[in-house]
From Swiss-Prot:
InterPro entries: Isoprenoid_synthase_dom_sf, Terpene_cyclase-like_1_C, Terpene_cyclase_plant_C1, Terpene_synth_N, Terpene_synth_N_sf, Terpene_synthase-like, Terpene_synthase_metal-bd, Terpenoid_cyclase/PrenylTrfase
Keyword Kinase: no
Free-text comment on the cofactor: Binds 3 Mg(2+) or Mn(2+) ions per subunit.
Catalysed reaction, written as an equation: (2E)-geranyl diphosphate = (-)-beta-phellandrene + diphosphate
Name of the protein in its database record: (-)-beta-phellandrene synthase 1, chloroplastic
Primary site of residence: plastid
Residue stretch of the organelle transit peptide: 1-49
Pathway recorded for this protein: Terpene metabolism; oleoresin biosynthesis; Secondary metabolite biosynthesis; terpenoid biosynthesis
Domain notes: The Asp-Asp-Xaa-Xaa-Asp/Glu (DDXXD/E) motif is important for the catalytic activity, presumably through binding to Mg(2+).
Pfam families for this protein: Terpene_synth, Terpene_synth_C
UniProt record similarity statement: Belongs to the terpene synthase family. Tpsd subfamily.
Name of the coding gene: TPS-(-)Bphell1
UniProt keyword annotations, A-Z: Chloroplast, Lyase, Magnesium, Metal-binding, Plastid, Transit peptide
Length: 621
């Protein structure tokens, strides 16, 4: 009991100040005297403190720490070998034909193999149609049809829920749970209190115990709905606990089938670690094909998946040329995971028109990784100060004052950020470069305290660590320029509702920093990086074990995810939902990489599987 009190107390105080920050945007410094230093003067200076377990490099006589990272897993030959036949006119024409057929089905809502839709099933049928096209990854074609279907369902929504149809005599768990989830995700004002109607007189969720397929699907949709919880919704927490236990028990009884595969997938990835394109691939494989309409849905999903696969090849080739042009293959001390980052971008931005978003996201994410390896591991303090000053100067002429290994990195950042600012200007109708430069200045400044912690062996408090990590983690860099290219104009005042220091951005940064630390802290410590949320939390709570610290941090993450759900879906936001969803999905995809272990230090089985199933391998037609 004493241990529990020690664990919970700092969480309360932490929540009061979690979203405050000591950082303010500063004007860009035009006078950086450090940049006139001669490279020769740096050679004899000490590097960052070296852990006894860290690998050491002696290039140019400078003692350096290096990470134990493997080289690029995906060579150029593999990328060049990706099939491109799905761009043939016949596939594009077939996709257009299927889209029109499915629109007709949406709009008619009447005929299915000669039978008119019954008023006893029309609500569930509409929800099922919307849910199907979304999970199959083809919903972008049917936005008007989706709205009409959901408007219809919402017009019959009641405090006690809905039945399968508008004339159903009783409410139905499956229809109500699916309705709650789908309507909430589309901004309709539906309360989770509707689930109270499916409890017994003891206040517990109940089931028949027979576990028919219909009942199992109802509980599966209850589980899916429970993950879209807002802060303080106790009934959603209860629904998640009940449905998780029920589904795990059901898996032990039912035969291996499409239903069991779907349950296993959703229990594993849930919602917050479930990349949309990966779910689409899974759903194509388990989707029923008993009717002509169902067959057309699956065929369209597969054709679209493979057409996009052809586009991915061209974009990956472009990214690889960029990666080689700036000399990144020669930086042996850093992680070569540009292909993984492109995969992440293409898992969350699946519209072919969003090429700028995908490539910008991949490049910005890769910059964050390279700079993390430089500032946390490879660079000396004096080199880091020079690079920080160079970013603030924002002038390619300063590259001559940088160490050789930093020159290509600096020019890559300079050129790419400027290039993406021009892309954003096409959408925004204004120059956003100065705003982005300020974001970079703040980000690069936040690395210096962490470098000094490593150099001196200082271990900050938990709050001190989090305040700095909100910026140094780089979330803002990976989100800001990509969303500016999405096609939605974002005036300055609206952009500030989603960009740092807005709560939306803070939540994503803290969630990923905390989750990442629970997977990386041991490897980081071995490289001499003592500061992590785990070690800082243990410092603030003397006597607590690593296991208990991780448990408390995971509880924090679960609570923060509910707050992030609210920030995504709250009705009074002025930020377009497409931009909020893109930022939210960036959190989901990075969270996916941290689900079981550090997916970024070395490509894990899970990350390799993601690359193969969403980029490298087309779907069999």
């Amino acid at each position: 009991m004493a241990l529990a009190l020690v664990s919970v107390a700092p969480l309360v105080s932490m929540r009061r100040s979690l979203f405050s920050s000591p950082y303010e945007l500063k004007s860009i410094d035009k006078t950086i005297p450090n940049l006139v230093m001669c490279r020769k003067r740096m050679l004899g200076r000490p590097s960052i403190r070296v852990s006894s377990t860290a690998s050491v490099s002696n290039d140019d006589g400078v003692r350096r720490r290096v990470g134990d990272y493997r080289y690029n897993h995906w060579d150029e030959d593999l990328i060049d070998s990706l099939a491109t036949s799905y761009e043939a006119p016949s596939y594009l024409k077939r996709a257009d034909t299927l889209v029109e057929a499915i629109k007709d089905r949406f709009n008619s809502m009447g005929v299915d193999d000669g039978e008119r839709m019954s008023p006893l099933t029309d609500l569930y049928q509409r929800l099922w149609m919307v849910d199907s096209v979304e999970r199959l990854g083809i919903d972008r074609h049917f936005q008007n049809e989706i709205k009409s279907a959901l408007d219809y369902v919402f017009s019959y929504w009641k405090e006690k829920g809905i039945g399968r149809g508008r004339q159903s005599a009783v409410t139905d768990l499956n229809s109500t749970a699916l309705g709650l989830r789908t309507l909430r995700l589309h901004g309709y004002p539906v309360s989770s209190d509707v689930l109270e109607n499916f409890k017994d007189h003891n206040g517990q969720f109940t089931c028949s115990g027979i576990q028919t397929e219909g009942e199992i699907r109802g509980v599966l949709n209850l589980f899916r709905a429970s993950l879209i919880a807002f802060p303080g919704e106790k009934v959603m927490e209860e629904a998640e606990i009940f449905s998780t236990m029920y589904l795990k028990h059901a898996l032990q009884k039912i035969a291996v089938s499409s239903l069991s595969q779907e349950i296993e997938y959703l229990l594993e990835y849930g919602w917050h670690t479930n990349p949309p394109r990966l779910e689409a691939r899974m759903y194509m494989e388990v989707f029923p094909q008993d009717t002509i309409y169902e067959q057309k849905l699956v065929e369209l999903a597969k054709v679209e998946f493979n057409i996009f696969h052809s586009l991915q090849k061209r974009e990956l080739q472009s990214l690889t040329r960029w990666w080689k042009h700036y000399g990144f293959p020669q930086l042996s001390f850093t992680r070569h995971i540009h292909v993984e980052y492109y995969t992440f971008g293409s898992c969350i931005a699946t519209d072919p028109k969003q090429s700028a978003f995908r490539l910008c996201f991949a490049k910005m994410s890769y910059f964050v990784t390279v700079l993390d390896d430089i500032y946390d591991t490879y660079g000396t303090m004096e080199e880091l100060e020079l690079f920080t000053a160079a970013i603030k100067r924002w002038d390619p002429s300063v590259v001559d004052c940088l160490p050789e290994y930093m020159k290509g990195v600096y020019m890559a950042v300079y050129d790419t950020v400027n290039e993406m600012a021009k892309e954003a200007e096409k959408v925004q109708g204004r120059d956003t470069l100065n705003y982005v430069r300020q974001a970079w200045e703040l980000y690069i400044d936040a690395y210096m305290p962490e470098a000094k912690w490593i150099s001196s062996g200082y271990l900050p408090t938990f709050q001190e660590y989090l305040d700095n990590s909100k910026i140094s983690f780089g979330t803002r860099i990976t989100i800001l320029q990509p969303i500016l290219t999405l096609g939605e104009p974002l005036p300055h005042e609206i952009l500030q509702e989603i960009d740092f220091p807005a709560k939306f951005n803070d939540l994503i940064s803290v969630i990923l920093r905390l989750k990442g630390d629970t997977r990386c802290y041991k490897a980081d410590r071995a490289r001499g990086e003592e500061a992590s949320s785990v070690s800082c939390y243990m410092k603030d709570n003397a006597g607590i074990t690593e296991e208990d610290a991780i448990h408390c941090i995971n509880d924090m993450v679960n609570n923060l995810l509910k707050e992030l759900n609210w920030e995504l879906l709250k009705p009074d936001s002025n930020v377009p939902i497409s931009c909020r969803k893109a930022a939210f999905d960036i959190c989901r995809i990075f969270h996916h990489g941290y689900k079981y272990r550090d997916g970024y230090g070395d490509a894990t089985i899970e990350v390799k599987n993601l690359v193969k199933r969403t980029v490298l391998e087309p779907v069999p037609l």
